[in-house]
Each structure stands twice: as structure tokens, then as C-alpha cells.
Amino acid sequence: MTYARPADRAGALRLHLNENTGGCSQAVIDAIRQITAEDVAYYPDYSALLKECAEYLGVREAQLVLTNGLDEGLLAATVNGFRVAQPAAGLPEAIVPAPAFEMYSVFVKAAGGRVISIPPKPAFEFQLREICGAVTERTRLVFLTNPNNPTGQIIPREALREVARYVPADVTVFIDEAYFDFCGETFLPEIDAHPNVIIGRTFAKAHGLAGLRAGCLIGDAGRLNDIRNVVPPYSLSVFAVAGWRAALGDRDYLGWYRTQVEESKELLYRAAGRLGLQYWKSGGNFVLINVSRVGDPADFVEAMATRGILIRDRSQDPGCGGCIRITAGLVRHTEVVIEALEGLCAAAS
């Protein structure tokens, strides 16, 4: 299995990858412009960024690993989870509740493991009993996304506790909080009580640093020491370090963009309701909408693209038949996509 990156179209409105459609803070651009030729020639120094990021998150530096995007953190956690405790027989296993971010399965298979997929429930309720029932002596990882992508559903904290308590101590429970900034739900206050939990965060979404690749892992210091043996020593560029530090200092930009996303989601909910389309309220910066009533989702996505708007076909995800996913970003962009959505629905009537 490989990750198939959705096609881009020059000049199109990008509402297909859950990026920050408002760009990044001007402070980030200003910081990058201060980089000198000497800075580029030398390997980057992470020490100040590590300190500032730990303070921003409210954790100790020993509980934090900085990564080249959250993807690098996911890969490192997967490789380490399989490396430190091989099962007596058979392939190491990772439990992945569906639907889920595709890279979990890609990384598990690349690391020589087997994916145990947990089918979704009808209303995308969290599959607590099914996850616990899938744990075997070969289980090494459990991937949980909170909120989920692509459904946007939030996992109750007590359910996360149940999983962390149920699995053996050598099993890593990876909680992917890529969309934390849009819902505020986090397991971070619980990490000292659950040393088998690793939390993944990204600064690509709300902070607008997707092009710089800025992610991190948070968890037990001992477990993260093992992961540091997997992460390259200089995987962040000097541009990422400078931009990341600047982004951490601009809380006003973060607050402004969160407000834009919340308003955009409300607009999408109301539009879908008016059009008689099923949708799910989301804890992320996106909304999942079922368009099967008015047409095939692949055709719908292509029709949007011809109008200069890129959205994502999620109809092949388990439980998501007929669904598209639309990034909720700037309100003015959302108004454009809603106008197109209304036009396509009217044409299909």
C-alpha cells in the first residue's frame, strides 16, 4: 500500500488536504527572511526551539521529540514499537480503527508489520470494545486519531484511558492529535499516568507550517529516548526551526484562524442541511458530507475541480460511501465552495 497524493491544479482553491488556507503568520515569513548564508551552511541547532516548544505545550523537554512533520514521528514510533519487542511468533501487529489516516497502514507495512483494521460503526462511534478485543500477544501498537480524520469525531477521554489501561505495558498507544487546535480535546494531562501513550502533534494545520514540516511526539521520557534512536539527528531544516519558533510566539494569529475555521464549519453545516445532505459535525478543520443523494462523489469532486475548487473524495474509506471531505478554512473560501456546492446540487435535481 502506498499513499496516493491527491492531484493538484495550479491556481485552484485547495480545500482537499486540510491545509491552512490563510497561510501562516507574517512573523514566520519575517523570521525566515533573517536566515543568513552561514545559517544555511551549518547543521541546525534545535535547543532553543525544543525549550520553547516544551514551554508552549506545558511539558518537560525530556518528554518531547521534534520531528520533520508528524509523518516522521509516526514512522519513528512505528519502527521503534516493532523494534523493541518482537512477538515470539508471527508478524508484529498494529491495531487501526477505521476509517483512518492512510499513512498508519503504509508505515506499519513498511516496517514489516501487519495492520489489524477495526471496522467502523454506523454512526462512527468509537470502537472501544472491538479495539480491546483485537489485542493479542503480537500487538505492538494501537493508532487512535482524536479527532478522527476523515470523520471529525472526538474520542471521549475516558475511552482513551480504557485503551491505555487495557493493553500490555509494552504496547504503544499512539494518539494522533493533529487537529487538536480546532477542538481543544487532548490526552496531554494524562501522559504521566500512562507511560505507554505517545501523543503526536503537528503545527501544519492551525499554524500553517505544512510546507516547513513541523511535528512532535510527546510522552514518557524513557520511551521517547528509544524513539530518538530512530529519528535522524538533523531532520529539521534551519528554515523550519526559525519559522516554527516564530509561529509559537504569535498567539493572535492562531486565535484568528481558529475563529475562521469555526465560522466556516458552521456555514458548511447549514449549507449541507439546506441541501438535504448528510454531514457530521467535526472537531477538525474539515467537514465530511455525503453527496450520494445528488451524484457520484468522484464525479462531484471532478466537477468542483473544473470550477477551480479542490476537495477530497473519501468514498473509498470504510463507512464513508458517498462522502466527500471539504477543508474549512477562511470564511471567504468557504462561501465560494458553498456557492459551487449549491450549483451542483441544483443541476442534479
Explain the meaning of each model-derived region.
Residues 82-144:
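PLP-dependent aminotransferase-like
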Residues 122, 262, 274-307, 324:
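Conserved PLP-binding catalytic core of the aspartate aminotransferase-like
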Residues 54, 109, 128-137, 150-206:
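Active-site pre-lysine segment of PLP-dependent enzymes
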Residues 26, 294-301, 333-336:
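Short, conserved charged micro-motifs
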Residues 303-307, 316-349:
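PLP-dependent enzyme catalytic core of the Aspartate aminotransferase-like
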Residues 25, 196-280:
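PLP-dependent aminotransferase class I/II
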Residues 1-72, 76, 348:
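N-terminal small-domain helix-loop-helix segment of the aminotransferase-like
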